[in-house]
From Swiss-Prot:
Transmembrane segments: none annotated. Its EC number is 2.4.1.227. It comes from Arthrobacter sp. (strain FB24). This is UDP-N-acetylglucosamine--N-acetylmuramyl-(pentapeptide) pyrophosphoryl-undecaprenol N-acetylglucosamine transferase. Pfam families: Glyco_tran_28_C (PF04101), Glyco_transf_28 (PF03033).
Length: 366
């Protein structure tokens, strides 16, 4: 490695869950090494094609090579496709004169891990989920520098570093930002605020239950900001956007830090980023894990729930009756909310981006 210039290739993409920590790690590397040369690698069809350039990073792409989980023709084609992707990855690493590869998971990472191993380029990995993905399980076999967002993640050589997140979130002072955030989001400064989100893709079952709970929430003096997800506005019986006293819906909020500052209680899915961010900033939460997949979201929520910073309810049990029984009394109890906030914040990690940057520097110094 040239002492004057560090070349880092960052691999990952497909979803915001991979891209957000990648961008946070990149920003932290720029802080500790202002002369660093950064190149992100993703696929041509993922969200990274929009988010990475918007963050001021150069993006290279390679072919997407999913691993079939059942016997099929795609499984027979896998060796050839993977070999082609590894060649593409190798050319990218060579052209970048890469000193280190940082992978955050996703289809793009496996070929890059294999290409880096052949070139004896150090590999640094971040795993965002409680259950590690296949690509990072492969990469961890070749790496001594593996960071995980959740302490219980089983991955070879893992160190618990937390979830790298945007500085606007990790540096948030909820109390100091509360007034301005509520003003921005159109919320009353004095009423308790429930903010509901299903994530970037929305959550129709959550939306339905909240719509059926609005009268009870309003009668209890609770205001609700409902972030429905793009293209998923909640409609009334006449096909118009639902309206009610103390209720406002938007499809999307750009900047979750304002949501975290304004809310007394957050209700949503238990994606890795949401769970880690709510813990880091110390916000009480109700998690409704996504009822599909391998139960990963329920595992994500386990830590904050056990610590007393969050409640969890399965999707089928999340009904208007549950809202009346659990959420309304909670939002009417400031002392309990404050205790949950303290428990949540005690569990959170705000400097995961810097921890990962230090891991990268450690890898290249070996």
């Amino acid at each position: 490695m040239n002492a004057e210039s560090l070349s880092v290739v960052l691999a990952g993409g497909g979803t915001a869950g991979h891209i957000s920590p990648l961008l946070a790690i990149a920003a932290a590397l720029r802080d500790v090494r202002p002369d660093v040369r950064l190149l992100a690698v993703g696929t041509p069809s993922g969200m990274e094609t929009r988010l990475v350039p918007a963050a001021g990073l150069e993006l290279a792409t390679i072919s997407r090579v999913p691993f079939p989980r059942r016997p099929s023709l795609d499984l027979l084609r896998l060796p050839g496709r993977l070999a082609g992707a590894v060649k593409q990855a190798g050319r990218i690493l060579d052209d970048a004169h890469a000193d280190v590869l940082v992978g955050v998971g996703g289809y793009v990472c496996t070929p890059l891990y294999l290409a880096a191993r052949r070139r004896k380029i150090p590999i640094v990995i971040h795993e965002a989920n409680t259950r590690a993905g296949l690509a990072n399980k492969v990469g961890a076999r070749f790496s001594h520098h593996v960071g995980v967002a959740f302490a219980g993640t089983k991955l070879r050589g893992a160190r618990h570093v937390g979830m790298p997140m945007r500085r606007e979130v990790s540096g948030l002072d909820r109390a100091a930002s509360r007034h301005a955030a509520r003003e921005l989001l159109g919320l009353d400064q004095h009423k308790p605020a429930l903010i509901v989100t299903g994530g970037s893709s929305g959550a129709q079952s959550i939306n339905r239950t909240i719509a059926a709970s609005l009268d009870a929430l309003a009668k209890a003096g609770i205001q609700t900001l409902h972030i429905t997800g793009k293209g998923k506005s909640v409609l009334d019986g006449e096909g118009k956007p639902l309206a009610a006293d103390g209720y406002r819906q938007v499809e999307y909020v750009d900047g979750m830090e304002n949501v975290y500052a304004a809310a007394d209680l957050l209700l949503g899915r238990a994606g890795a980023a949401t769970v880690c961010e709510t813990a880091a900033v110390g916000i009480p939460a109700v998690f409704v894990p996504l009822p599909i997949g391998n139960g990963e979201q329920a595992l994500n929520a386990a830590g904050p729930v056990q610590a007393g910073g969050a409640l969890v309810v399965d999707d089928e049990s999340f009904t208007p009756e549950w809202v009346s029984r659990e959420i309304i009394p909670l939002l009417s109890d400031p002392a309990r909310l404050a205790k949950m906030a303290a428990s949540s914040e005690a569990l959170g990690i705000r400097n995961a981006d810097r921890r990962m940057a230090d891991l990268v520097l450690e890898a290249v110094s070996k």
